[in-house]
Design a protein with these regions (language model features):
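Membrane-embedded alpha-helical segments of multi-pass membrane proteins
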Residues: 32-52, 92-105, 154-163, 205-212, ...
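Alpha-helical transmembrane segments of multi-pass inner-membrane proteins
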Residues: 19, 23-24, 100-103, 108, ...
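Hydrophobic transmembrane alpha-helices and their immediate junctions
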Residues: 333-376
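Long extracytoplasmic/lumenal interhelical loops at the membrane interface
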Residues: 265-276, 287, 291-334
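Hydrophobic alpha-helical membrane-interfacial segments at the cytosolic entry of transmembrane helices
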Residues: 65-72, 119-130, 185-190, 224-245
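A membrane-periplasm/extracellular boundary helix in multi-pass inner-membrane enzymes
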Residues: 197, 218-264, 282-287, 295
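Transmembrane signal-anchor hairpin modules in multi-pass inner-membrane enzymes, especially those
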Residues: 1-79, 86, 100, 106-122, ...
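Transmembrane alpha-helices of multi-pass inner-membrane enzymes
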Residues: 43-44, 371-420
Length: 420
């Protein structure tokens, strides 16, 4: 196997490493920090590509598939908004972040050295710790933990994801030193604390998914039954421990209370409002399946739907902000094009990670497992909230899957025994 192609100078290598180290923490600590990190990383990636870091190698099938998936959002929005005669630039903001992931992947697959990818060992736990620090500094512990620019749902989602990326990153590229292992464990604990304080129930649903991914990647055929039993036991233990934590107990109890009130005709609860908005979205999708209602169409439909009694005034007010489901949001706004886009950005990267998850090269296999956690994690988060309506979360998702896919498939890159 040929050694990886190094960046054209040491400055580029250092900048790449610094960006990868800092971007998860900047998501929580600096308004605009995540977007700024991605823009700089994308610009540097383009410079590396123009400098010939790929040495004119042809694109591989996986790279082409990734590029098509990441560009599908811009194409979908363009087609639908042309149909609706509304091409306001703001509609393309989040989708543009996905496109920026393409040069990042292409450059890092060939220009990423061991030093560059080694930064990820620290990035994810530091990001989780930064989330806890941001909540503590801003003293927003009253009801739901949040920051001045990240609401409690997105905060909890990102924190729980970084917690498990920290945990699964233990002994990523070899046997970790004790300080590095303690850092990763601290990141895991910090992420869990923020998730509990945020009381974001959608993030908790992803925990069994993360565990299942890890077990699948380490599954050996002759131990199938033992693995299934261990998974069931792990879920049971986590469930029992979680039930003893008051905020979790309270939020889980509210699910049954909300559903009971909804059946009794009291629709303006947390779950009741979501059910109303999902019903409204499905109604509009049935009426406009091909081109959707346009980027602003769902918000505009809220008042008329409230006036005819399909949804309550409170649901209409909240629906002007979001649909509370990423898949329904993209489908109701952009029709089958939006549905294709959101499925592509979830499951094409997931498939590419899945192919690498049982690689004989541990660093690449662990990178792939973590990538599977990111893609399926965002899929689960997006069942109950829009995840890509915020540009910073769209940037975080697209940057992270690009970086992890580069680490999982990097040309000739089989780093070993970092962290010693």
């Amino acid at each position: 196997m040929k050694p990886p192609i190094k960046p054209y100078n040491i400055a580029a290598e250092n900048i790449l490493g610094a960006l990868l180290l800092a971007y998860p923490a900047l998501l929580f600590l600096v308004r605009g920090g995540m977007n700024g990190s991605m823009f700089v990383l994308a610009i540097l990636s383009v410079m590396l590509l123009l400098a010939g870091c790929r040495k004119h190698l042809p694109l591989q099938a996986g790279e082409i598939a990734f590029a098509l998936a990441m560009s599908s959002g811009l194409v979908a929005i363009l087609i639908v908004q042309i149909y609706h005669h509304d091409l306001a630039a703001r509609y393309f903001d989040s989708a543009a972040r996905f496109l920026l992931a393409v040069p990042i992947l292409l450059a890092l697959r060939h220009a990423g050295t061991e030093k560059v990818f080694h930064a990820l060992q620290y990035a994810f736990p530091l990001g989780a710790i930064a989330a806890l620090l941001a909540v503590w500094v801003e003293n927003r512990w009253h009801a739901y933990a949040q920051t001045s620019f990240l609401n409690h749902i997105h905060l909890g989602d990102m924190a729980i994801l970084l917690a498990f990326l920290s945990l699964f990153g233990i002994n990523w590229t070899g046997r970790d030193s004790l300080p590095l292992k303690l850092l990763k464990i601290s990141g895991f604990v910090a992420g869990l604390i923020v998730s509990v304080l945020s009381q974001a129930r959608g993030s908790w649903i992803a925990i069994p998914i993360f565990i299942a991914i890890y077990i699948y990647a380490h599954l050996q055929t002759k131990y199938v039954m033992r693995t299934v039993l261990l998974f069931a036991l792990a879920v049971l233990v986590i469930g029992l421990v979680s039930w003893s934590i008051e905020p979790i107990q309270l939020r889980i109890g509210m699910i049954f209370s909300d559903l009971s009130q909804f059946r009794a005709g009291h629709a303006d609860t947390s779950i009741g409002i979501r059910l109303q908005l999902w019903g409204a979205a499905l109604h509009l999708i049935a009426e406009n399946p091909f081109f959707g209602v346009g980027a602003g169409g769902f918000a505009e439909a809220m008042q008329p739907m409230s006036e005819v009694g399909r949804i309550t005034p409170l649901a209409a007010e909240l629906g002007r902000g979001e649909v509370h489901s990423e898949i329904l949001a993209q489908t109701v706004r952009f029709g089958i094009f939006g549905l294709g886009f959101v499925m592509a950005v979830y499951f094409i990267p997931f498939y590419l990670f899945l192919r690498q998850a049982k690689s004989v090269h541990r660093p690449q296999a662990i990178s792939a497992i973590m990538g599977m956690c990111v893609t399926l994690g965002f899929f689960v988060f997006g069942l109950t909230v829009e995840t890509f309506d915020l540009k910073m979360t769209a940037a975080f998702y697209s940057t992270t899957i690009a970086v992890l896919l580069a680490a999982a498939t990097a040309a000739g890159n089989h780093p070993n025994r970092h962290g010693k």
